[in-house]
């Protein structure tokens, strides 16, 4: 069947900012799809609000709009561009919901826009819980006993019929937003009211819990001729009850009999045929472990997290082929790009095992509720490939970067067995490691199976890992056992620990005895056809399939799993670096382990090694490939942390030298450099003990900022005001980084400025300066950044330029550097310097059209910036105003305080661009999910130090016509200035403010932190209540003031004559 010729222009909707439940997998899918459509000759228009993606690069589509993903903005683009068709199935839940809204409002019909891919009716049948249930009943496919409710009362009626436990699933949401498992009336009331709030259709499905069943997924493809195949089937190690995004997953499934496998396969294909899906689709099923009974849980009629995993697990490019199916091509006429000889209608087969483990943010949010359920909490994931299940699991564990390298906890031996069992009884992110500890203590697999419902197959594999540990301990120095342990994925570090040796001893022993891994190809067909892909994994076998060429090579380290503080921005830089390396004529090799990203698409680099980012795993690749050098500055802290270790093996680190990287990180050396080049910094000291920290703080004067050295994303960083707070911090934070001391700095309140620059050692190019809306003290990743700066004097800009050039030259930077400054009372001070690619590189690259990561890579390879055509200093400004606004995922993380401070908390970002600051801010806030209303009620409760400042904001909001509520102290201050205000009661009292928020009477909350136990708890409760009820809460007065500017620009002033 030829492709459709009745359409020329296609609008593709992206998925927007990275949030929990919707991460980098959609950048990968969207990029693939746009390129596939262009390949077929269509004109592609893309709209997405996330600047940190490869997808929003100009080369990916014919026209790129970085605009908020709301009905109104997309409608404007449709009216302006007049596309013939809209492809919504590659933009996650956001894309689907937009398609439904644009259809319902009549915009698509009025502009003659057709929907491509899966029909709208099918999307609604899969997403609307009522319609889906009806269809399943018609097909005789069992679904769990359930009911659709639109009110809390209806939920209680259903509970009377079936009893607890119950699972609540809101309609039209992703990542299980608002859903959960309920065991009692209180939980049912909370979860259902939450779920109705988050569901655009105010609809929840309530079903009898089948927790304990096996959860199986099939990733399927279908075209318009009804050809349908299974691309990959996957098994969740965790039984039903934990969201698949939070489950440990293995592919292919390990515990299904052939009868079970074929039965579930047939059902999956039957369902997507009945739904009429064209493209990729994910089917989730629950199988009773003791019979052939099964239920269908849900169907995602779109490309998803699971399809990104399935693509990387099999090498089969689902998103690319789904896009081509959407324009009418069929599976039997498209070649499989991996083999280049077989067709896309062949089902992939695997001769290896894949393990995926989610990456959770609890190392950042130690107080967050860790218990896992049907609402997703992971920010990202890692994948590993091995020849045995044990090997793939252990490789995945050491890819997580939790400081855990094995099936156990770093201080596991210190726990009591009772505590270990108690932790296993709760489903949380550490359960796997506690199971390892329990097996070490001799707990029977039967007991573990009864507690967890994890299949005996997996428990036996865990047991095998522990058995090998014992064998190692009993056979110290025995090469046979060393080889055996390597076959099952043990790292040198773990073997060294069992043999009471150093990791390097084991490495040297392996080298001397030639015990090295070989690299196998991922080819979709278990080596049945000749394959051309350069996609490899390491394993301890005999034949090496990775053929080393005689071309000069450069190895780029990726940034691993997505987590808070290290997002898709680093993947963006990695991909651009690879393109620059290829353009310069070198062979580009990537090492990375994140299945969601563009960098792990085999078509990006000349060779892709899907391996853990550890010293051992990277050295094994270097020993084989012998690259000219390794690039670490694009892979975030993950890659930087490996530089030292690789250099000790004699590996050449390209770009800024290791000495200079360390000079930027080492406090004393950095201070010496600043004195030498005369760049001021806030007064600061280094402390290695609580006593020393107190002496330092008293000498400098409070408030001080305290943080461990060598961390990313402001981990364990705090602003403290007195001795007591400092003592509390020191007893908890010193463990944050034992080999490295704690830094104590004077805390300067002032404007925070961020600068990214590129240097070749001679010329320093500054693409732009960004000014933060929030004053210093809020982490740069959580601040709203504005380009070009709006309130700086020319003198200040000249000073910033001068200091940036001095720092880049003083540190001998080759490549990228990111600097944060503060402008306080009497001048410009440097806060910190990062000699690497930063979070703002994609944002600035998009604005200025200077491909910063590529330019940096060219400088690293020896080109001079002057030859390329750049002059030193700040580059000419782009027209317009650009805003980078942070996006948070607090609604998915219970018990996490949303107050902004020096620890980073946002998971993603959006860009707003327009001709004025207010319009750009409006777009940034709207794109980040903040509904800006020109009237309503604002609730204010601020700390004493902020009371003077809140008066101005209250006055302006009152002028616009906002109604003001305030707690007693704040209200008194406003009354003193003749601002009309209504006093609300304290928590727990009459007419308390939480009830007001819960009843939907408040549109905005402004709440700043007051220290002190009781008040802090109240403040925390207020902030969490706003999150649970979807009310915007501002914890910084600078953000509140900026929002007030936006509202003022939307309204007319009303004053009597």
UniProtKB/Swiss-Prot annotation:
<dbReference type="GO" id="GO:0005737">
    <property type="term" value="C:cytoplasm"/>
</dbReference>
<feature type="binding site">
    <location>
        <position position="210"/>
    </location>
    <ligand>
        <name>ATP 1</name>
    </ligand>
</feature>
<keyword id="KW-0028">Amino-acid biosynthesis</keyword>
<feature type="domain" description="ATP-grasp 1">
    <location>
        <begin position="133"/>
        <end position="327"/>
    </location>
</feature>
<dbReference type="GO" id="GO:0004087">
    <property type="term" value="F:carbamoyl-phosphate synthase (ammonia) activity"/>
</dbReference>
<keyword id="KW-0067">ATP-binding</keyword>
<feature type="binding site">
    <location>
        <position position="832"/>
    </location>
    <ligand>
        <name>Mg(2+) 4</name>
    </ligand>
</feature>
<dbReference type="GO" id="GO:0006541">
    <property type="term" value="P:glutamine metabolic process"/>
</dbReference>
<keyword id="KW-0460">Magnesium</keyword>
<feature type="binding site">
    <location>
        <position position="832"/>
    </location>
    <ligand>
        <name>Mn(2+) 4</name>
    </ligand>
</feature>
<dbReference type="InterPro" id="IPR011607">
    <property type="entry name" value="MGS-like_dom"/>
</dbReference>
<keyword id="KW-0464">Manganese</keyword>
<keyword id="KW-0547">Nucleotide-binding</keyword>
<feature type="binding site">
    <location>
        <position position="208"/>
    </location>
    <ligand>
        <name>ATP 1</name>
    </ligand>
</feature>
<dbReference type="InterPro" id="IPR013815">
    <property type="entry name" value="ATP_grasp_subdomain_1"/>
</dbReference>
<feature type="region of interest" description="Carboxyphosphate synthetic domain">
    <location>
        <begin position="1"/>
        <end position="401"/>
    </location>
</feature>
<comment type="pathway">
    <text>Amino-acid biosynthesis; L-arginine biosynthesis; carbamoyl phosphate from bicarbonate: step 1/1.</text>
</comment>
<dbReference type="GO" id="GO:0046872">
    <property type="term" value="F:metal ion binding"/>
</dbReference>
<comment type="subunit">
    <text>Composed of two chains; the small (or glutamine) chain promotes the hydrolysis of glutamine to ammonia, which is used by the large (or ammonia) chain to synthesize carbamoyl phosphate. Tetramer of heterodimers (alpha,beta)4.</text>
</comment>
<feature type="binding site">
    <location>
        <position position="241"/>
    </location>
    <ligand>
        <name>ATP 1</name>
    </ligand>
</feature>
<feature type="binding site">
    <location>
        <position position="298"/>
    </location>
    <ligand>
        <name>Mn(2+) 2</name>
    </ligand>
</feature>
<keyword id="KW-0665">Pyrimidine biosynthesis</keyword>
<feature type="binding site">
    <location>
        <position position="298"/>
    </location>
    <ligand>
        <name>Mg(2+) 1</name>
    </ligand>
</feature>
<feature type="binding site">
    <location>
        <position position="284"/>
    </location>
    <ligand>
        <name>ATP 1</name>
    </ligand>
</feature>
<feature type="binding site">
    <location>
        <position position="284"/>
    </location>
    <ligand>
        <name>Mn(2+) 1</name>
    </ligand>
</feature>
<feature type="binding site">
    <location>
        <position position="832"/>
    </location>
    <ligand>
        <name>Mg(2+) 3</name>
    </ligand>
</feature>
<feature type="binding site">
    <location>
        <position position="707"/>
    </location>
    <ligand>
        <name>ATP 2</name>
    </ligand>
</feature>
<dbReference type="GO" id="GO:0004088">
    <property type="term" value="F:carbamoyl-phosphate synthase (glutamine-hydrolyzing) activity"/>
</dbReference>
<feature type="binding site">
    <location>
        <position position="169"/>
    </location>
    <ligand>
        <name>ATP 1</name>
    </ligand>
</feature>
<keyword id="KW-0436">Ligase</keyword>
<feature type="binding site">
    <location>
        <position position="752"/>
    </location>
    <ligand>
        <name>ATP 2</name>
    </ligand>
</feature>
<feature type="binding site">
    <location>
        <position position="780"/>
    </location>
    <ligand>
        <name>ATP 2</name>
    </ligand>
</feature>
<feature type="binding site">
    <location>
        <position position="834"/>
    </location>
    <ligand>
        <name>Mg(2+) 4</name>
    </ligand>
</feature>
<feature type="binding site">
    <location>
        <position position="298"/>
    </location>
    <ligand>
        <name>ATP 1</name>
    </ligand>
</feature>
<feature type="binding site">
    <location>
        <position position="832"/>
    </location>
    <ligand>
        <name>Mn(2+) 3</name>
    </ligand>
</feature>
<dbReference type="InterPro" id="IPR005483">
    <property type="entry name" value="CbamoylP_synth_lsu_CPSase_dom"/>
</dbReference>
<dbReference type="InterPro" id="IPR006275">
    <property type="entry name" value="CarbamoylP_synth_lsu"/>
</dbReference>
<comment type="similarity">
    <text>Belongs to the CarB family.</text>
</comment>
<dbReference type="InterPro" id="IPR036914">
    <property type="entry name" value="MGS-like_dom_sf"/>
</dbReference>
<dbReference type="InterPro" id="IPR033937">
    <property type="entry name" value="MGS_CPS_CarB"/>
</dbReference>
<feature type="binding site">
    <location>
        <position position="832"/>
    </location>
    <ligand>
        <name>ATP 2</name>
    </ligand>
</feature>
<feature type="binding site">
    <location>
        <position position="779"/>
    </location>
    <ligand>
        <name>ATP 2</name>
    </ligand>
</feature>
